[in-house]
Amino acid sequence: MNAEPSAVTPAHALPGWRRAVLKVGSSLLAADGGGLSPRYALGLAQFVSASLAAGREVVIVSSGAVAAGRAIVPAAAAAGTAMAARQALAALGQAQLIGLWQRFFERPVAQVLLTHDDLRNRRRYLNARATLNELLRLGALPVVNENDTVSVDELKLGDNDNLAAIVAALIDADVLFIASDVDGLYDADPRTHPDARLLAEVPELTPAVLAMAGGSGSMAGTGGMRTKLEAAAKAGAAGIDTVLFNGRRAEALRELAHDRLSGTRIHAARSRIAARKHWLRHAPLEPGAIVVDAGAAAALSGKGASLLPGGVVGAEGDFRRGDMVQVLLRGDDGERRIARGISQYSALDVRRIARRHSRDIEAILGYNYGGNVIHRDDLVLLQD
């Protein structure tokens, strides 16, 4: 494959996708640097609606709460430190932001507020993933934003670009769309170089490509092209392509709705399956293991099944829900490591539900994190 970026040409095809994250910047929702406006949000909502009608799933990561708060209380009236003022404005504006999105959709819109700490902690990460997947299953439209009211370090350049990449990996999205007020990535700053070319395809984020990124070009937003490329690198490491496009251009949205590329597509560094398996294979192990019987081992190895409690013999160590553990098979011929994966239950809980049916979990524990001890998406066979 050609590793050089290519200039835009008509009718570049965008590979089909089933699940996407759409990141919407403040420059599209508060174009004048003031309060929220539906001017560009409407076109984005129509793109989302068309995608949902086609049987696809979309999670929106939306900036704009601080910008909305400024219109409610002038910044000069906000007391305290600059950080405290921004956090207060975020609290005031978040209700306005979710209300803006709700007005465009007949289906329920769900507000999900996250911090980077939520996604660094493995157990909270799993809970966030389960919540988003359940919202999608229910047919709701999740609208994610950073929880600026309680964040400290996170209120900085480009947070929602990077948050969108993390959310894309969290829900196993096929593509990350980043909508802003620029057409995509140019080989030079188009504001100072009239002959700058818009790049349609970026096969690899090389240092030369990163050097093409300029600074922020909008009043309302906090992230420039550099942070968008950083987000694309994060998504690419998880096997997810990124598309940068101009959310102010109705034509761009129409093209994307018909799977035609408008803007810049940044290719993933590796396939999603390869990225996931690599992470599962090399993530640090917690002390402990889940011991399974021969039937469970055969189901894992031969059928690609999830690990159910009925096939579990016991658990070793003191691991917690969300920890990476080994899966062992013990028999007359000794012990064999057959897999590693993320346990949905603690070691104590695994011991209590071992040899039991999945439907009995809640009766035994008083709660239920799902019918699998390790879901097949969170498990890698060691002979793979």
Listing of model-derived features with the role each one plays in the protein:
Residues 2-384:
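C-terminal catalytic "cap/lid" subdomain
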